[in-house]
Amino acid sequence: MMFTAGLAADILFYSFCEWILYANDPHIAEMGSMQIWSSTYPIFHWGPIPWSFYLVLAVAFGFMLHVRGCHKQKYSEACRPILGNRADKLPGKGIDLLALFALLAGTATTFSLATPLMAQVLSRLTGLPSSKWVTIGILVVTCIIYTYALVHGMKGISRLSAACMYLFFALLAYVLLAGGETRYILETGFSAIGNLAQNFFSLATFTDPQRTTSFPQTWTIFYWAYWMVWCVASPFFIGSISRGRTVKQTILGGYVYSLGGTFLSFLILGNYSLGLQVSGKLDVLGIYGGAGDLYSTIIAIVDTLPLAPMVLVLLIAAMIAFYATSFDSIALVASSYTYKQMTGD
């Protein structure tokens, strides 16, 4: 549940196409090989640093809930050592309101990124024109699924999370084994991980002080801000489901499962589409340059797979499951902000 709650459908959207956004960037050209750096930066931006945002806070919140026995799951409660009794008054309420607004902004950002892709996939499968009504229909279906899981409590969320993982790994396995780029995916993936390990600190501290390309401002800082917005929800949820686990188990479990799933997604889906470009089987950059549309570019990538309609069905089902699971965790956290005091589990 850590993985599915911490990431919405954005991971599938960006896994296919993030390297495309980097490929023609002047900063990538400065660094050398487009192939290696375009596959390295996605796992850097979605890798150890952002997951550490979640896990460090999850440990703190889990300690507050399960060891200290705190019955208030709010950011204002975490500020009580500083605010004192004012955590229950206007300053504390202001902090909780800011957290809720940040949560709504993060949710809106997530919907705006991946929902148009689902609408185009559905349009492609059914022949219906891609319109706002198709998008609304997708949102309604997603809301029905996550509401059904939510009313069944943690058991419902757990089952939905398991279904999400089955769909997710089925998609990855099919692309890896049936796409015809298995060797390239594996070799480029290992190269990207090694390149990240070798250059991790230089990537993390590069600020482009002369603004020659503004790459870190455009991408790296944007991603850190994007992940920090979700820190108002995901760490609380991870902390709440980590009852009975040690600090070591929470952190290592989060890194092994969540970071592992993230890396697999980018290294398989991203390197598959990159392999198509490098081998000349599909001019991915040309399609994106001509259309200026990542959504149609992703569909063109999926069309190169055997049984492409089946893959599109699997893709949209996995994205809906990711959305529903993520929003279940958000709903639980948002509702906890509204309680004066929580009782029971």
Walk through the language-model features, giving the residues of each.
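Flexible loop linkers connecting adjacent transmembrane helices
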Residues: 1, 20-41, 64-90, 276-306, ...
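Membrane-water interface regions at transmembrane-helix termini and the short interhelical loops
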Residues: 1, 39-46, 60-71, 120-125, ...
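Membrane-interface helix-loop-helix modules in multi-pass membrane proteins
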Residues: 1-72, 252-255, 261-274
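Hydrophobic, membrane-embedded alpha-helices of multi-pass small-molecule transporters
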Residues: 3-18, 49-66, 100-111, 134, ...
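Extracellular/periplasmic helix-exit of transmembrane alpha-helices
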Residues: 14-26, 175-195, 199, 259-293
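Hydrophobic, small-residue-rich membrane helices and short re-entrant helix-turn-helix hairpins
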Residues: 74-90, 148-168, 185, 222, ...
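Membrane-interface loop-to-helix entry segments
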Residues: 95-99, 103, 109, 151-178, ...
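Transmembrane alpha-helical segments of multi-pass small-molecule transport proteins
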Residues: 126-151, 170, 224-236, 345
